[in-house]
Amino acid sequence: MTIQIIVLITAVISVYALSSRPALEKMMLNPYQVVHHKQYWRVITHGFIHGDYLHLFFNMYVLWEFGRPIFTIFTNQVAFTQVMDGDDWWGSHLGQNLFLMMYLGAIFVASVPALIKHRNNPGYNSLGASGAVSAVVLIFVLLFPTSTLYLFFAIPIPAFLAGILFFVYESYMNKRGGTGVAHDAHLFGALYGLLFMAMIAPSSITGFVGKLMAMIN
């Protein structure tokens, strides 16, 4: 249910913001406004608005496709549900709470590069859920490294290779610059996703290696 709610809320807020320029400007990530005018809400709200409908559709489609299997693991793993007392609200909803923490945390972490680099630039703005979606994609790669993904919707490659290509491409484009895309936000979001999993489920790292070794052998 959590993913459906995230998609619905993001779609509603994005459509509203696209129809109201003042609302869009109020919710965008503007590091200058965050740092100098304490408009801290922007580090989260920017992840729920998009520049156009294609941007919105692509991010929510990727979140839906990659997020569902992750959410299933979060909600079904005994290791997660036994972390806290199942009788209290947090414990009984631990899986969905972890997913929500991961997603919101990724939105915030993805904003960090811009906050550092553009804190004195009042003209810089950023928006979109791409940083959080990058976290979701890389967690999928970590949990299902040997599953098949389709590059450009046509070329079948294993998920772990897609993960490698992601980091190579985003790193190159971030260094190149001039694209108008916050590639550093994608990188920070993806790295956060991997770190999040390493913290809540260290076995996911060894499991990743084990699955790769099994595939090679």
Question: PLM features: what roles do these ranges have?
Answer:
Residues 1-217:
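A detector for small-residue-rich transmembrane helices and their helix-helix packing motifs
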